[in-house]
Every structure is written in C-alpha cells, then in structure tokens.
C-alpha cells in the first residue's frame, strides 16, 4: 500500500474522502446529518487517566519521540528529492498534524473533568473564567485556598485585573465546600496533564512550521504552515494536492455533520481549512467567501510549484501573497468620491433692458402720444358714433367725439422730435459750405423760404435770394479775394513784369 493510500485510509469521515477524491465531478452537497455521540464519557471516575488516555498511549509517545529526533537534526533542502510523499519525514509531519486535533479533543475532556470536580469547591468560577486553559491554570493556582486570589502575582499572569477582582469578591461569598486531600491531588494531576498536552501541541506546531518551509515553502507562505499541513493531509499528499482544481481545494476540511440537538445555523457550508485560515479571517465577514476562492486559486499554483521543487526560497509564494494582499486592499477601499460637475456656462443672449437713461429716452420716443391715448380711450355708458359700423376702420374713441370745445394743437415734444445723428449733421454742414447752399442749420431763416415771390405788378415772380450775395462775392474776387495770386506778365517790348 502506498503512502497516499495510507493517508486516505486515516481519514475519519467518508464524506471527506469522496470530496478529496473527486476532482472534476460536481455532486450535490448532502444535507447536514445528525450524528449521535459515539462514546458517552464517564466523568464519575476517580482518576483523569480513566477518561483521558492519549497521554499514556503508545502512538503519542512514538510521534513525540520522532519529532524530537527530527528537531535535533538540521533540515536540508537538498534531501527533498522526487515526490514529497517519498520523504521519510513527511509521514511524521502528517501524523503530527493529525495528533494536534486529538490533543484538542483531549483538552476539552480534561477541562470538563476538572470543572465537574472543582464545582464542589468554587461553582461560580466556571462562569467567571470561560476559557478552558485559563480555568485549568486558575484551579491549579487556587486549589483549596480561595484567599490566594488577593495579591497573587502568578494569578495576574493568567487573568486580567478586572477578572481577578470579580473572582476574589465571588470567592468570599461562595457556598462551596472544602475538597479532601485525595480529591485535590487528582485535580492537580488533571491540571498537570492538560498543561503538558498543551505544551506538546505547541511543540508540534513549531516542528510542523519549521519543516513545511522545506516541503512546501510557497504554499506555507500563503496560508501558513499549519493550514498547509492540514490540506496536504486531507488531499493525500502534495502531489495529489497539485492535481486538484481550486474549487475542490477550497472545500478540503469542510464540516458537513453536526451533533444531534444542536443548531445547524452556525454551520457554514462550502467552507474548509482555507476559509478558517488567518489570511481569510482577517477580512470582514462579507468578503471571506470571495477571499477563500482567491486564496484557493493561488494555493493551487503554489502547490504545483512546490511539487516540482521549484522556487525553494519561496519567491513565487511571496509574489502570490503580495497579489492577494493587493486585491484585499482593493476590495476594502472606500468608493470613489462622486465628482461634482460644475454648472454649464449660461447662454448670454440678448436680454430685455428694463432700466437706464438710454432705455427711458427710448420709451419716451416710442411711447404713446396724446392723440393715440385719446383714440384708445372710451367712455363707459356712452354710445360711440361708429357703434353700428357705418364706417370701416378702427374706432377713434374720445378723439372722434364732437363738441369738445378745445382746439387741438400740435405739441412739439423734444423727446418725440425727429433726430439727426451728429455724423449726418457734419456731412450736411460741409456740403452747405462747399456748394454755398443755405439750410436751416447754417442760417436761421425759415424753412419755408422760397425763391418764388408775389408782386403787385407782375404777380408771380421768381427771385434768386442769393443774387445779392453773388454780386458782392464777384466784386471781392477782383482785388480783395483770398484766392488772388501774383501774375507774371511779360511786356512785348521792354520785357518788364507787372502785377
């Protein structure tokens, strides 16, 4: 029988064997079964050795002796050649890893034995110190004398100051009875056995951790030496582990059974050793399943590297672990802050001006005149002259009424007067100067002045109003003209110049 077959034969649960042996098949997860406790512990015995038999077993002594033997030897990486399962030390590592589980069960049995025996002396201590090892150390320290709770330095190394104060107050009012010397001796024996088993468990952990760095260095870096040894033992060796897909590696060590009478709500389906490893448990609960899938995928790669004895220094393992931690940090990052978009620039279109000097003058110029106001005004209760629509057109209102007795005169309003721009005024002024024209701007004459005159003799006579001015201008052009120049005249005979 090969070593892999022996490891498979050592598995306790047949369901785990099926799970470890099926790689590509996806079979439906069976319902959680109720199993009865196989052995009913008889705690009425006088000695703890009658119920806790692991300490005196031959298997425990052989494994611990081999562990001490291999610890004394210096491990060498070059000794690990070929399949890891063929290494002589590999079997010891797997057995030692399985032994830690049995030690945990044995410690629970001893704790229950001590609790039942010591409840005669101090029944309240069980509720004050819930931890099993702390309870065992406290019982060994107190013994039959509960006054040791006060000012005890050894007890301060076991319990916190607040717990010590509560224990001392409760011990002063307890209704417990004194233990006999024989009962106290049996309790001390049970306490010593529990503490020695706990020390052996830590010794096994140190050994497995030191040796897993040579057998599977990359896998140990990712999930730790203890978890790596557990999944290797369940899978049947490193070679079988390297052949398994990540979805099956994640389920190795899944608890699919529970004791009868206990609730199954706390049992997490599809969770194994990887889910309960430190690297996954360090995350919030809502990310642990996702993290377990990621770690299982990286463990598959690391196991394949270790099975071929590559990257013995763990370089690949450190790279995979860094990648896992980066993804963990990315998952736990807070969501990005929503970018506040600025408001778009408003459309500066032409807006209606509602004030200002220019606007007020424009309203005066384009506003309603008095005539238009009179035309728009109507009297209440009076019949209009055009009420029967005899004339086509708009009604004239008050403007069309007769007999008002007032003479309408055109009101000259500076605001409504026609305006000429300054540029046009300068242009007209230049034209009047050049062409000698006359205008109301140049001369203060009436704008109705005309060259047509009415005389009693001839009737209608056309008169040039500029004739007099023209005569004066012609006279001045001879001698007093501003345009006169010197003229050079050559004489016919003498050749003299005259002006």
Curated annotation (Swiss-Prot):
Site Interaction with U4 snRNA and U4atac snRNA: list residues: 270, 293, 298
Q: Where in the cell is it found?
A: Nucleus; Nucleus speckle; Nucleus, Cajal body
- Indicate the cross-link positions, Glycyl lysine isopeptide (Lys-Gly) (interchain with G-Cter in SUMO2): 471, 478
Q: Which residues carry this modification: N6-acetyllysine?
A: 438
Residues marked Interaction with U4atac snRNA (site): 289
Q: How is it modified after translation?
A: Phosphorylated by PRP4K during spliceosome assembly.
Tell whether Ubl conjugation is among the UniProt keywords.
yes
Q: Where are the Phosphothreonine modifications?
A: 440, 455
The parts of the chain that form a coiled coil are: 85-120, 181-215
Q: Where is this region: Disordered?
A: 1-43, 334-357
Q: Does the keyword Repeat apply?
A: no
Q: List the InterPro entries hit by this protein, alphabetically.
A: Nop_C, Nop_dom, Nop_dom_sf, NOSIC, Prp31, Prp31_C
Question: What biological-process terms (Gene Ontology) are attached?
Answer: mRNA splicing, via spliceosome; ribonucleoprotein complex localization; spliceosomal tri-snRNP complex assembly
| GO CC annotations on file | Cajal body; MLL1 complex; nuclear speck; nucleus; U2-type precatalytic spliceosome; U4 snRNP; U4/U6 x U5 tri-snRNP complex; U4atac snRNP
Keyword annotations for this protein, in alphabetical order, are: Acetylation, Coiled coil, Isopeptide bond, mRNA processing, mRNA splicing, Nucleus, Phosphoprotein, Ribonucleoprotein, RNA-binding, Spliceosome, Ubl conjugation
- Stored Pfam families: Nop, Prp31_C
Q: Which GO terms describe its molecular function?
A: identical protein binding; protein-macromolecule adaptor activity; ribonucleoprotein complex binding; snRNP binding; U4 snRNA binding; U4atac snRNA binding
Q: Which residues carry this modification: Phosphoserine?
A: 379, 395, 432, 439, 450
Q: Where is the composition biased (Acidic residues)?
A: 7-40
Family indicated by similarity: Belongs to the PRP31 family.
Role, per record: Involved in pre-mRNA splicing as component of the spliceosome. Required for the assembly of the U4/U5/U6 tri-snRNP complex, one of the building blocks of the spliceosome.
What the entry says about domains is: Interacts with the snRNP via the Nop domain.
- Describe its assembly: Identified in the spliceosome B complex. Component of the U4/U6-U5 tri-snRNP complex composed of the U4, U6 and U5 snRNAs and at least PRPF3, PRPF4, PRPF6, PRPF8, PRPF31, SNRNP200, TXNL4A, SNRNP40, DDX23, CD2BP2, PPIH, SNU13, EFTUD2, SART1 and USP39. Interacts with a complex formed by SNU13 and U4 snRNA, but not with SNU13 or U4 snRNA alone. The complex formed by SNU13 and PRPF31 also binds U4atac snRNA, a characteristic component of specific, less abundant spliceosomal complexes. Interacts with PRPF6/U5 snRNP-associated 102 kDa protein.
Q: What is the protein named?
A: U4/U6 small nuclear ribonucleoprotein Prp31
**Organism of provenance:** Mus musculus (Mouse)
Q: What is the lineage of its organism?
A: Eukaryota, Metazoa, Chordata, Craniata, Vertebrata
